[in-house]
């Protein structure tokens, strides 16, 4: 975030009118604030980024692996079937909120994707999610 602010990109990004896609850390930077480094972020999404806190011995952080996503409510997921898997690798998450466009569950439910106006974001990595991720990226390019 410091580099974005130092170069003026923080203001430029918020003013963009074309579709914008943030992936993983990109989604987190689009939120209001992050527990990682106690950083104020872009504030595109009125949401906080929180660190996963394991509840059981088998809960590992970072969360790395394949999860299904549900409640897909965005043009990114056009043609998306239920129970398709996408790949995650992250230690921080965004709680479900008014901008949530898809959810998943690891330790507890969280936002797998966000959408507001021309801004789209995924916590998972579509570029690592095989044909499902390819479809999501194609849907974004078709916006």
Indicate where each model-derived feature is located.
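Amide-donor transfer/coupling interface in amidating biosynthetic enzymes
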Residues: 2, 12-15, 48-143
